[in-house]
Amino acid sequence: MEMHPWLPNLKYTEEMLKEIGVNDIMNLFSDVPQDLILKRKLNIPYDKPLSEYEISQRLNELKKKNLELKYPPFIGGGLCPHYIPEAVKFIMSRSEFYTAYTPYQPEISQGLLQAIYEYQSLMAELLEMEFVNASMYDWASAIAEAVLMAHRINRRKSVLLPSNMNPYHREVVKTWVYGKGIRITELPTDSTSGQIDIEKLEQINTDDVSAIYIQQPNFYGIFEENIEYIVDFAKKKNIITIMGVSPLSLGLIKPPGEYGIDIAVGDGQEIGLPLNYGGPLMGIFAVRWDSQLVRQMPGRIVGLTKDEKGNRAFTLILQTREQFTRREKATSNITTNETLMAIGSAVYLSLLGKHGLRDLAEEIYVRSHYAKKKFEELGFKSPYSGEFFEEFVIQFPKNYNLIHSSLLNKRIHGGLQLNDYCALFCFTEVHTRVMIDELVKSIAEVL
């Protein structure tokens, strides 16, 4: 009987091995160390394949081992819990948007293209930047792309990254710039304020510096107060400025465009996206109006034009700068984007509105400051004096590992451990005063 060519069988295997001159299939793995090769059958604890119902039962048993938290997590580090309106979830789940399709054919993609265009427009208004792309993977890859973009423009071989930026983002940037031979110079943090040390910045040799990155607020949740000075310092030396921002904080503080920032990046997680093992995330990428910046900008851009009949039409524009051209000429090889997530963020911002954004930012500010006050009442202080938003660091007299374990026993997820005695906490609109009070009380009981 003729076997289907897609189904593996001994006859076809032997023919393929003979064709490539190999006697045994294991010879194909000769470069793999022998101690890494599994030479026994898989230890599957069932004597027969399970039915769908049996698998469902088994998965439910495993699920019961998970720790069900009493409250939303208080762990900081850039990804914090926020309330997502049901309308956002509903619109994102519609089949018109819930697709992996890339809208290369504008004539059949007007609805999807318009949704992306609306996201770009909303984000441009929020950031006060003229051009926003259709999104990136996440904040970390957006920073990496910004650094590579700056290098393409001025051909310099060094980038300034502050020590108070998200350390996980720094690792991603380090990976991406390695192949280009771009050096990373660290900007020290002032030990008192938690902000970039301006005096140390002025001492750095900037002759070969391509770009400087600022995170606002920084990894410790602290607002950088010297951004105007840093931007002026950079422009005098023809250094490209990159700012990473928390979208919700823009309800209270100046947007990047108002500072004259060249490239703005961030993450859309806090504006309408759920937390799920580090994803799904959505990188924000924007530039000010400058033809060189726009031409070197990575990612897709949706533009508005007219068709041959004079009707409004949406289409992908400036495609020669992206991966539609030869690989070595493309502005980005990280590629793709997070269109569905971008649409979710657009819906979220539309529902929130300008006043709603400010109200939400104020609520987060008030709740996080209430939490810090409760910590201070019990003698727990932050090592930094700078003004903060949503997140802050607390130093404890005992090893934080003991505190965190005790909290987990009470089904409370505490802060992100930074060292033996410090942890980074976050407080948002989903954390009530009752929750905050119990967190602080539970920590005090351990100490």
Curated annotation (Swiss-Prot):
List all membrane-crossing ranges: none
The major lineage groups are: Archaea, Thermoproteota, Thermoprotei, Sulfolobales, Sulfolobaceae
Q: List the disulfide bonds.
A: none
Q: Which NCBIfam families match?
A: PRK00451.1
Q: Which domain of life is it from?
A: Archaea
What Pfam family does this protein match (any one)? GDC-P
Which Gene Ontology BP annotations are present? Answer: glycine decarboxylation via glycine cleavage system; nucleoside metabolic process
The subunit structure is: The glycine cleavage system is composed of four proteins: P, T, L and H. In this organism, the P 'protein' is a heterodimer of two subunits.
Q: Whose protein is this, by species?
A: Sulfolobus acidocaldarius (strain ATCC 33909 / DSM 639 / JCM 8929 / NBRC 15157 / NCIMB 11770)
Q: Which GO terms describe its molecular function?
A: glycine dehydrogenase (decarboxylating) activity
The name on file for this protein is: Probable glycine dehydrogenase (decarboxylating) subunit 1
In which family does this protein belong, per the annotation?
Belongs to the GcvP family. N-terminal subunit subfamily.
Main function: The glycine cleavage system catalyzes the degradation of glycine. The P protein binds the alpha-amino group of glycine through its pyridoxal phosphate cofactor; CO(2) is released and the remaining methylamine moiety is then transferred to the lipoamide cofactor of the H protein.
Q: Does the keyword Oxidoreductase apply?
A: yes
Q: What EC number(s) does this enzyme carry?
A: 1.4.4.2
Q: Which reaction does it catalyse?
A: N(6)-[(R)-lipoyl]-L-lysyl-[glycine-cleavage complex H protein] + glycine + H(+) = N(6)-[(R)-S(8)-aminomethyldihydrolipoyl]-L-lysyl-[glycine-cleavage complex H protein] + CO2
Keywords tagged on the record? Oxidoreductase
Q: Which InterPro entries match?
A: GcvPA, GDC-P_N, GDC_P, PyrdxlP-dep_Trfase, PyrdxlP-dep_Trfase_major, PyrdxlP-dep_Trfase_small
